A protein has these predicted regions:
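Conserved Radical SAM active-site core
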Residues: 1-72
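Generic, ordered loop/turn and secondary-structure boundary motif
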Residues: 3-5, 98, 163-168
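Short coil/turn linker and secondary-structure boundary residues
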Residues: 7-10, 89, 111, 140
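Active-site beta-loop-alpha junctions enriched in small/polar residues
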Residues: 32-34, 60-62, 79-81, 106-108, ...
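Short, acidic/polar
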Residues: 12-16, 86-92, 143-144
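Auxiliary Fe-S-binding modules of radical SAM enzymes
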Residues: 17, 21-22, 109-174
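Radical SAM/AdoMet-radical enzyme domain recognition
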Residues: 42-121, 126-129
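Flexible, active-site-adjacent loop/turn segments at secondary-structure boundaries
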Residues: 2, 92-95, 160
Length: 174
């Protein structure tokens, strides 16, 4: 399923007007999977950059990121084995990651943690970008993940999904 809520079709100009009206200079494009919109997403990114916005694109890693402008910060959400979605990852995206990008692993278990360490090592991610580890809410306690990171002296950021703690997990507030 692409979206859990009804949306509204908007032109790029309509999106730009809303962004301009907000007064915010940082725009994150996320989804679903924003790259499923193809050329429309790329066109929106380019228009935002032309207007001087700082742009972030959060992608689930199933689509190629090579067409995204170099000025954009890509947040690549790596699917771990226990998510049941790791087979959908396009691992060639890891070759295109640049210093300003982020690779985020949402971990469900110690197995996911070990797998993620292997991916970080294989693609030299600690040297090439920011790496974030997030414990899956209700499946892995943040304290356990923090302990493993410290024991292994990993150069990663512990990233807590704050919306899961602020709002009820079933709410769609953010």
């Amino acid at each position: 399923q692409y979206s859990y809520e009804e949306g509204a079709d908007m032109t790029i100009d309509e999106v730009l007007r809303r962004v301009d009206f907000s007064g915010v200079r940082l725009v994150e494009i996320t989804g679903g999977e924003p790259l499923l919109q193809g050329e429309e997403t790329i066109a929106l990114i380019n228009k935002l950059l032309e207007k001087g916005y700082e742009v972030l694109v959060e992608t689930n890693g199933s689509m190629h990121i090579q067409e995204i402008d170099e000025r954009v910060t890509v947040i690549l959400d790596m699917k771990t084995p226990d998510s049941g979605m790791s087979h959908k990852m396009d691992f060639s995206n890891l070759e295109s990651i640049k210093n300003s990008d982020e690779v985020k692993f949402v971990l469900c278990s110690r197995n996911d943690y070990e797998w993620s360490k292997e991916i970080i090592s294989r693609y030299r991610l600690e040297e090439r970008c920011k790496v974030l580890f997030s414990p899956a809410f209700g499946l892995l306690h943040p304290r356990d993940l923090a302990s493993w990171i410290l024991e292994d002296r990993l150069c990663v950021r512990l990233n807590i999904q704050l919306q899961k703690y602020i709002f009820h997990p079933g709410e769609r507030m953010v």
